[in-house]
Design a protein with these regions (language model features):
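Short, cationic low-complexity segments
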Residues: 84-98, 176-180
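Phosphate-binding glycine-rich loops and adjacent basic patches that engage nucleotide phosphates
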Residues: 76-83
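Extended hydrophobic
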Residues: 48, 52-68, 172-207
Length: 207
């Protein structure tokens, strides 16, 4: 049994100005609609046949925010059930370093705590829960791992992630005509810049 908590706090590499924050509507998973603040900026976007998303760099720590929104005809639950570890890690790497899209993301805060064993198994991480798992390099005793729980608290706003620090708005960032608006349930993750392994991962279903 492992109990872990994840804390990330940093400002954006390219921040938001006051004119980049506007109220809009978010279509909740439960069928209701919420009025929330949306943050708009030019970011590197990606897409495939089932989803689209973007990456946004953090200023100080070697991580970035990744958001993935399934297409309108695919529910978040269905997308998660079919999501593999390879797809999760590879999809954000398809972004172009020079092509930017206007992206609008809602401000959100999420607090959750519970078992992530099923989530890990769904993306192919199963050996650690079997008798074949070898933890001898880290522990003197023979251990069997039967569950992993994680407590996550994250807030995404115009200043950064779980951060009260002001980030400087980049008025020289390139702009495009097309846009991506995350106005329905999506996946968020804070990932390592090199490996794209998630430090924090979760979903925004209702605001």
């Amino acid at each position: 049994y492992i109990d872990s908590s994840a804390i990330v706090s940093d400002s954006w590499l390219r921040g938001y100005g006051e004119s980049d924050v506007k109220q809009g509507s978010f279509s909740n998973q439960n069928g209701s609609t919420a009025k929330v603040n949306f943050l708009t900026s030019a970011e590197r976007a990606f897409s495939d046949e089932d989803a689209e998303g973007f990456v946004k760099d953090l200023k100080s720590i070697p991580c970035k925010l990744v958001c993935i929104m399934p297409n309108k005809d695919i529910s978040l639950e269905k997308y998660l059930n079919e999501l593999t570890a390879d797809r999760l890690l590879n999809l954000p790497t398809t972004v172009s370093p020079t092509d930017f899209t206007n992206v609008s993301i809602p401000e959100f805060s999420v607090e959750s705590s519970g078992s992530i064993k099923k989530n890990l198994e769904n993306i192919g991480i199963t050996t650690i829960f079997s008798s074949d798992a070898d933890f001898s390099k880290g522990f003197a005793e023979n251990l069997i791992l039967n569950d992993v729980t994680q407590a996550v608290s994250i807030s995404v706003n115009k200043n950064g992630i779980s951060s009260d620090n002001q980030s400087e708005a980049d008025k020289n960032a390139p702009k495009t005509e097309e846009g991506l608006v995350l106005d329905r349930p999506f996946i968020y993750a804070v990932v390592d810049n090199e490996s794209y392994l998630p430090v924090i991962i979760g979903t925004v279903s209702n605001l």
